[in-house]
């Protein structure tokens, strides 16, 4: 189910989050001895926008950083994307390539709230 969309500052790309798929896996943020090595993640799907006719072409389907990405945003220059993951009580910040629209490595993450009902549902850069 599509949940959130975010046009990039240059309007060359469109990113959508999808909830409830859990088709991707990522390394677990919890490094304790009893944690599993990988956890499920819903995708963030990025499309390139054709400037002439507005058509979309798939760029990538990347992990959102966990389950149920309720909201995400980009910083002003489009080099960072923050994802709010409600079911995992986590916010994850990725590098983003402004030329390709692709996400890079995780540069920061934080646990926010407790339980499925209290996880973050939106994240916004304050610049």
Segments (PLM) and residue ranges:
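Feature marking well-ordered beta-strand scaffolds used for ligand recognition
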Residues: 1-127
């Amino acid at each position: 189910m599509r949940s959130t969309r975010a046009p990039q500052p240059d309007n060359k790309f469109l990113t959508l989050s999808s909830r409830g798929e859990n088709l991707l896996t990522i390394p677990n943020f919890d490094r304790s001895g009893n944690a599993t090595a990988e956890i499920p993640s819903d995708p963030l799907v990025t499309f390139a926008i054709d400037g002439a006719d507005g058509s979309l072409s798939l760029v990538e389907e990347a992990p959102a950083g966990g389950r149920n990405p309720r909201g995400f945003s980009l910083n002003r220059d489009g080099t960072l994307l923050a994802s709010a993951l409600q079911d995992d009580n986590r916010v994850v910040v990725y590098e983003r390539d402004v030329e390709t629209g692709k996400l890079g490595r995780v540069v920061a993450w934080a646990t926010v709230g407790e339980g499925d009902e209290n996880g973050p549902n939106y994240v916004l850069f304050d610049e």
